[in-house]
């Protein structure tokens, strides 16, 4: 199966502006890290967590692709630094450490359920959650559900204004999604995004973007089951982005 799915929502009204296969399940891959940091910020807002709390960890905690956490084995990292690493650099150990603070994958799923998302689910940790087995519902979402959830996190009342701004700031500082939507972005456009990559040709991105420096729409794109190389998958998403912008 080769599949791509997409959903675009107006970030103010929530109205679906364009969609393709919006209610099919695809693996979330690292795009879940935005939802995870949203859950962490929710705990901060409730007084159950502190962004400045330092978390110490060991070599045994490190998993594949941990470019930031591997440099801080001696001094540890704060919750704020871990969220930044998870979103801006897609650091997998940072994500696992943050998952531990909220109680694991099931608690992230429960958080999403409580905010009205009965579709998106996280079942495993990094890096196993990127396995992307066909017809496996573990660690998946649907683009319409993800678009709605992302909109609620970034513009709704679920998080405080400060936490909403913090989440979008981390996404705006994303350093690993350059070849995707960002490569098609005209000067002056705003983008805050998070990409994901997995096995079996899986690739994805969730983003808030728009002209005049303002995020006016939520864009969610996932693809899986492709034989394409990573460069080809990146180019495919960039081309979708260019088309979206052309017909904005």
Locate predicted features.
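Short, small-residue-biased leader/transition segments that mark boundaries at the very start
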Residues: 1-7
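Structured C-terminal helix/loop/strand segments within mature extracytoplasmic catalytic/sensor domains
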Residues: 4, 17, 100-101, 105-106, ...
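Active-site-proximal beta-strand/loop segments in catalytic clefts of secreted hydrolases
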Residues: 9-12, 59-60, 87-90, 101-102, ...
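Acidic helix-start/capping segments at beta-turn-to-alpha-helix junctions
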Residues: 12, 51-68, 102-103, 170
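Active-site SXXK
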Residues: 26-55, 86, 219
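Short, well-structured active-site flanking segments
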Residues: 42-61, 109, 160-163
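Conserved catalytic neighborhood of penicillin-recognizing serine enzymes
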Residues: 62-97, 105
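Mid-domain, small-residue-enriched loop/turn segments at the edges of structured enzyme/sensor domains
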Residues: 78, 96-155
